Amino acid sequence: RARAHNATRGAAQGGSTSQPVTPLAGLEHGHTLDERFDGNSPKTFPGANNGEDWKVRNFGDHDWGNVDLTEATAQSVNTAYAELNLEVGPEKTADVAARLGIKADVGVNLANVLGDATVTPLELTNAYATIAAQGMKATPHIVASVTDSRGNLVYEAPGADKRTQEFDPEVMAAATYALSQVVETGSGKPAQAIGRPAAGKTGTSTDNKSAWFAGFTPGLATVVGLYQSGPNGEQEQITPFGKWVDSEITGGSWPVEAWTSYMQTAAANLPAGEFPDYTPPKPKPTETPTETPPEPPTEEPTPELSHREVAQAPRRAHR
C-alpha cells in the first residue's frame, strides 16, 4: 500500500476552517466585528454568481437572525459570511489566504469564503500559527537544522529563521477575539477543557467528506483533519463512529476532541500566556421605526421640500 505524509500531502476541502480569511480581509479594509448581517438560511444573492443567482445555506438550514461578525464566526453562519465576501470582494479573500500561507488555489469567486479550496493540514497550521503570532509569518519546516558531532552545520532548512510581519497586530487581535468565541460559545466548546486561553475554528466540508478543527493557544497552533478514502482513493463521506455513530462526523465532534486531548499534553509545559488585549465593540442596536407625533394644526401652509432637501432627508438603513 502506498504511503504518504498526510500532514504535508494529505489534502481535503477546508470547509469553515477557511472562513476567518474573509473577516481578516474585511478588518484590513475598514470593516469591524460589530457589523451585522442577515444570518438566516437559505439566502439568495441575485446575480452575484457571474450574473446568476447565488444561493447559500447554513449548516442544517439554521436561521440565526441578525448577527454580528463575532457571532457569525462562533456559529459558522455561512449566509453572513457570504454577504461579507460580496462586500469585501473575493479577490481580497484569496489574497489574504495566500499571505497566511495557504498555497492551495483559492479561486477568485464568491464561494471561496465557504472553504471550497483543498488544503493540507500543514497549510492550515501555518495560517492559524500566523494568526496566533499576531501577523508574524514563519516558514514551515520539520527540522530546523542539523549539526554533526564537531558542531559543524550540515543542514539548515531554507528560511527556518525567517519571520515577516504580514498583518497588522491590531487586525490579528480582533481576529483572535472572534476565534476565541468559537471556543467560548460555539462549536469548539470542548476545547475549553485544556484550561488555558484557546481559539480556533471547526470545519466540515460538503457531504461530510472532511472534518477539521484548527486552533491555537498563545504559544502553539495545531490542526486536526479527518477524511475517509474509498477503495480507489477517492474521498467519501466519513462513516460515523464511536459516540457519534448515530449522528454524523463534523469538525465539532471527533476533530475538536482529538485536538483538545493532544493539546492538553503538548502545551502542558508551556507558559499559559494570554491573548492580546482587545476590547470588543459594543453591539450596535437594531434600528426600529418610530412614529413622529402629529404637528399641531396651523393656519399657515406647510412649504413643500425642494428636490435637494428630499434627497438629503434621512432614510432608514437597509441593514
Each predicted region: which residue ranges?
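Short active-site loop at a secondary-structure junction
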Residues: R1-V21, H29, L33-S41, V67, ...
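Proline/serine/threonine-rich low-complexity "mucin-like" segments in extracytoplasmic/periplasmic regions
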Residues: D277-R319
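Extracellular glycan-interaction surfaces
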Residues: L24
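Short polybasic/polar patches that bind polyanions
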Residues: L27, L86, A98, A132
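Conserved catalytic neighborhood of penicillin-recognizing serine enzymes
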Residues: H31-T93, N109, K137, S149-Q181
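A penicillin-recognizing enzyme superfamily signal
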Residues: R1-G14, S18, E71, T118-K284
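Secondary-structure transition/capping motifs at alpha-helix termini
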Residues: L27-E35, K103-D105, A133-A138, P231
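Mid-domain, small-residue-enriched loop/turn segments at the edges of structured enzyme/sensor domains
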Residues: G51-R57, G89-N126
